[in-house]
Amino acid sequence: MGIDGENGMSTIMEQLKSDHINISRLLVTLEEQMDVVHDERNADFELVHDILVYMTHYPDHTHHTIEDLVFQKLSNYDSTARSVVSQLGREHAGLAKKGLRFLEMLRHVVDGALVERDVLENTGRDYIEFLRSHMAIEESDAFPRAERALSDEDWEDVASSIEARIDPV
């Protein structure tokens, strides 16, 4: 990535925060579509499906990998952060499972299969709320700690570990 020092931290953290903004926008759209499902109107299931395809690819495979690298460095410096870092790691795995479960339901719907509205809505809302709660912990706790604790060399290490992947949103 060719990032060093303070610039490296800025670039990495700006990307993570930008990703969260994009993800939050998508969650608003998902929530709107779950409201449509709840009201027994015709949701745009292809849109919801496309959002979940994105969510189960970029955030689950790239964004969370970068966070995990940052959080691992953080846990090396801040023993009080180990609990939240461990929690966030477990949540990354949980988010991937929840996302794939929701995506599988959406594939069935898009393919014309019958899926109970309340099951679909509850699965969608559970995913949305879990992800929002997860990002809130990162933004209020883990990100600020990492920004304070990691050295320039740590940010260089993280940057050199990141594959050059561009967020498709």
Predicted regions and their residues:
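Small-residue-biased structural context
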Residues: 2-169
